[in-house]
Amino acid sequence: MNETELKALLSRIRPADSAAKAAAKERQSKLAKPPGSLGALEEISVRLAGITGRVCNRIEKTRIVVFAADNGIVAEGVASTPQCVTLAQAINMTRGKTGMSAIARDFGIDVEVIDVGINSDSVPETILDRKLGFGTANFSKQPAMTRSQAVDALAIGIEAAERAHNSGADALGIGEMGIGNTTTSAAVLACLLNLPVESVTGRGSGLTDEGFALKKRVISDALALHKPNGADVLDVLSKVGGFDIAAMAGAFIGCALFCLPPVAGGLVFLFAALAAVRLCKTVRDFIFLSHASYEIGYRAAAAELGMEPWLNLNMRLGEGSGCPVAFQVMRAACAAMNDMATFEEASINDNYLENIRNESAFCVKTV
């Protein structure tokens, strides 16, 4: 895929189905409960209707796709974890032995791990090979990747979403594995939102004070060197991004293209989602946020999208670890929408709710 083909593909993405959303809100108003009493579950069911075009939905078959890649910037000492852990954990994901994959296995969720840039030539066949390189370049010295590679990474993500759609998945969780990607994601967010590096950079997996100061300095120096254009997502991704972030952005785009509900599972995923929305604002209609990340920068990105995560569990693992839990929330939303009785079916006169219905504070809100 080249940039012209990417633009043509983005032009095919259509907004959420407003008629289906309106019909879903109408059904919510007839269910035997006080208006708005199921809170976010009502909003989720309405947004799902907009994505699928159906008022009633089921979230039965789910998948989490993990994009694994190394980041050359770790050569600058910005990560406390050795780079070899990327491959080790990618393998462990295929065995159900990481945080995300253990939870996913317990819930019966399919996990697909894709190598988009692991720095190893000994990646097992249980990991899908879509390698774009042996990690990105060290962006403190040169651009992380070429624009062509950034587009290729987006295409890999789009392909993964299409594959999930074709497999019959009802929702797709987006995951990652890549030592150093809190550094790349902070650099990307600082560019996209034009924010100071200090306000979007966290400690990652546990840097010391000295390491944390180094991390912020490395990012600041790289931004000064490359001067990424925040209005050009491909410029930002190619200069200071990662293969995993670009592929995740592509997965969000692919989900919008194939009307498959995607879940952003935490910090790095949210930044990738923001990049996808900057490429095509309509993608926002299709994104769900599972849980608030403990890491700094999450709030700024969520506010930019105008979205709130469903859960606050003080999580900061990454991997897409919030997605398995989020799928259960989506199932709950669908169960209420599909299976609750209406006032008429429950033989309840709902006239007593008229005043409550007239109060906007109790209306179903959708983003």
Q: What are these regions, as identified by a protein language model?
A:
Residues 1-367:
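N-terminal loops that bind phosphate or other acidic moieties
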